[in-house]
């Protein structure tokens, strides 16, 4: 097998096949078969994610795999972003379909068609739905197992809210969930970026992406969170009856109201009025101005009485976010070494393998190994490999290859000392503990976790370099580094960088770092923000 230290790309291509993660002998490009070991690990990952999503109010649902084109095309920006990637179903049996179907590339349109039917009033909000499924995109670039494919296993979540503020609060919760997955489960070296305008989700207002940095210095997008605003709510007519008729627009500081004929007016009121209104209770009398009319309002009930001529129905605010098999593949790529995979222990199908070292008294060793297995099998996913046709050396090689996090060696010495020898997969560190100290296994897992997190943190710090000139940028990219550079935020400059260096402007920090005192790394014009630039998958 190719060594990761010598050729990480080729190592990855080999290891996901040799370690029983996937088999791509299936004759459709970009659609591999997930073997039981690999699929179990992915399911454990999705289970952890689903539990976290439910902790922030999300509920599971299932939507059809096909979407009528008439529904899919309702949001114009969305269709422009995906139309070239979709798989079409134009016939059913011998009949040509009048309304062609597509295999879902993502589920916004099919979900929102139904959300419009489910939501009536503010009491129905928030609505938060997740679905672990497969999506299909006709990927024309070269495919790469788990990283770039045509059938994508993933989890997507969609949320619907009363206001922009509520939507943004939910995005912050979604980010916490994803940070748990990327950091506490997968130990990935990653950064959050806000995508530039030209690279945000089709049909969205803002896109925040988690970009992991792979061993070869390339970015791998492992998750995204989108503020959709009202861009889907309007074409899909997702409205709700609110307890007041005032509303905001994305990117506009003003507050508006509409009469029942659709005429729109700006509303002027004290800041305190808006603050109390959002809490659902007014504690004093306020004067508000709508167009050339003034109203005195002292309660929510008075809003309903005095503002009957206005429309209390509003468009919802929405978010969507997703994690795919890419995060799983990225973790395998990042954590592995020359010996094989290093499986993150929270998703490892086998967390601990017990290997009896047979010799003078095989019966004692086997019986003791079974005893150890019984003591720990209810707490961990444990496999006792008592196959006497294979040597311990072969077993060490195999379980290193598939990345089992901990190995327990049991020979006659361990039997006599009432102990076990534990070997960590990531760094080969050995521990000898008494059978009365099995709680120390938790400590070993925790120590392993902290070491892997520190490794990821150090890697990000080493990989990201600040540059100010194009020559410095070029040098950083040639050295497979990630550059942080001042940038004018023009798409034309980003395109030139991509053409010349085969690197992409990924975006700013979530809270953009101001670069107004600097010059754009490409064109030399005044810069706006510091951005991350690097090669990508």
Curated annotation (Swiss-Prot):
Catalyzed chemical reaction(s): tRNA(Pro) + L-proline + ATP = L-prolyl-tRNA(Pro) + AMP + diphosphate
State its Enzyme Commission number(s): 6.1.1.15
The record, for Gene3D superfamilies, names: Anticodon-binding domain (3.40.50.800), Bira Bifunctional Protein, Domain 2 (3.30.930.10), C-terminal domain of ProRS (3.30.110.30)
Q: Where in the cell is the protein located? A: Cytoplasm
Which N-terminal stretch is annotated as signal sequence? none
Name any GO cellular component annotation: cytoplasm
Keyword tags: Aminoacyl-tRNA synthetase, ATP-binding, Cytoplasm, Ligase, Nucleotide-binding, Protein biosynthesis
Q: Which SMART domains match?
A: ProRS-C_1
Q: Which GO terms describe its biological process?
A: prolyl-tRNA aminoacylation
Q: Which molecular function GO terms apply here?
A: ATP binding; proline-tRNA ligase activity
Domain of life where this protein originates: Archaea
The answer to keyword Nucleotide-binding applying to this record is: yes
The record's Pfam families line, in alphabetical order, gives:
HGTP_anticodon, ProRS-C_1, tRNA-synt_2b
According to the UniProt entry, the note on domains is:
Consists of three domains: the N-terminal catalytic domain, the anticodon-binding domain and the C-terminal extension.
Q: How does it assemble?
A: Homodimer.
State the similarity comment: Belongs to the class-II aminoacyl-tRNA synthetase family. ProS type 3 subfamily.
Function, in words: Catalyzes the attachment of proline to tRNA(Pro) in a two-step reaction: proline is first activated by ATP to form Pro-AMP and then transferred to the acceptor end of tRNA(Pro).
Name by which UniProt lists this protein: Proline--tRNA ligase
Task: State the organism named in the record.
Answer: Nanoarchaeum equitans (strain Kin4-M)
């Amino acid at each position: 097998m190719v060594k990761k230290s010598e050729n990480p790309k080729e190592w990855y291509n080999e290891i996901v096949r040799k370690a029983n993660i996937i088999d791509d002998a299936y004759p459709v490009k970009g659609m591999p078969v997930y073997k039981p070991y690999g699929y179990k690990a992915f399911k454990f990952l999705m289970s952890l994610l689903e539990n976290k999503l439910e902790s922030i109010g999300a509920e599971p649902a299932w939507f059809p795999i096909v979407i009528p084109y008439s529904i899919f095309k309702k949001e114009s920006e969305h269709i422009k972003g995906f139309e070239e990637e979709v798989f079409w179903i134009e016939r059913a049996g011998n009949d040509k379909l009048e309304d062609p179907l597509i295999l879902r590339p993502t589920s916004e349109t099919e979900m929102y068609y139904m959300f419009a039917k489910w939501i009536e009033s503010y009491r129905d909000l928030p609505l938060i739905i997740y679905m672990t499924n497969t999506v299909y995109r006709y990927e024309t670039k070269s495919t790469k197992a788990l990283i770039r494919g045509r059938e994508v296993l993933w989890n997507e979540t969609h949320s619907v809210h009363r206001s922009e503020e509520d939507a943004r609060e939910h995005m912050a919760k979604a980010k916490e969930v994803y940070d748990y997955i990327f950091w506490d489960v997968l130990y990935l070296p990653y950064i959050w970026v806000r995508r530039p305008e030209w690279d945000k989700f089709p049909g969205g207002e803002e896109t925040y992406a988690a970009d992991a940095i792979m061993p070869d210095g390339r970015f791998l997008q492992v998750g995204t969170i989108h503020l959709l605003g009202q861009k889907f709510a309007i074409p899909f007519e997702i409205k709700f009856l609110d307890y007041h008729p005032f509303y905001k627009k994305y990117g506009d500081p003003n507050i508006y109201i509409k009469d029942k004929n659709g005429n729109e007016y700006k509303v002027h009121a004290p800041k305190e009025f808006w603050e109390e209104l959002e809490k659902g209770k007014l504690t004093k009398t306020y004067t508000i101005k709508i167009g050339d009319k003034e109203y005195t309002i002292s309660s929510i009930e008075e809003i309903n009485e005095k503002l009957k001529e206005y429309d209390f129905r509003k468009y919802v605010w929405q978010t969507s976010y997703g994690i795919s098999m890419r995060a799983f593949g990225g973790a395998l790529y990042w954590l592995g070494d020359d010996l094989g995979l290093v499986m993150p222990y929270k998703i490892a199908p086998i967390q601990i393998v017990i290997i009896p070292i047979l010799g003078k008294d095989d019966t004692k060793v086997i019986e003791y190994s079974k005893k150890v297995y019984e003591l720990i099998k209810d707490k961990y996913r444990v496999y006792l490999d008592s196959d006497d046709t294979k040597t311990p050396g072969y077993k060490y090689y195999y379980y290193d290859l598939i990345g089992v996090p901990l190995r327990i060696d049991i020979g006659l010495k361990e039997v006599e000392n009432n102990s076990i020898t534990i070997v960590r997969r990531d760094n080969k560190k050995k521990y000898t503990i008494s059978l009365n100290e099995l709680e120390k296994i938790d400590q070993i897992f925790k120590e392993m976790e902290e070491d892997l997190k520190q490794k990821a943190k150090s890697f990000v710090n080493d990989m990201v370099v600040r540059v100010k000139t194009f020559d410095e940028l070029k040098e950083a990219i040639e050295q497979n580094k990630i550059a942080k550079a001042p940038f004018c935020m023009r798409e034309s400059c980003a395109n030139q960088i991509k053409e010349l260096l085969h690197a992409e402007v990924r975006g700013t920090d979530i809270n953009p770092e101001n670069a107004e005192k600097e010059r754009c790394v490409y064109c030399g014009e005044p810069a706006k923000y510091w951005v991350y630039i690097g090669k990508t998958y």
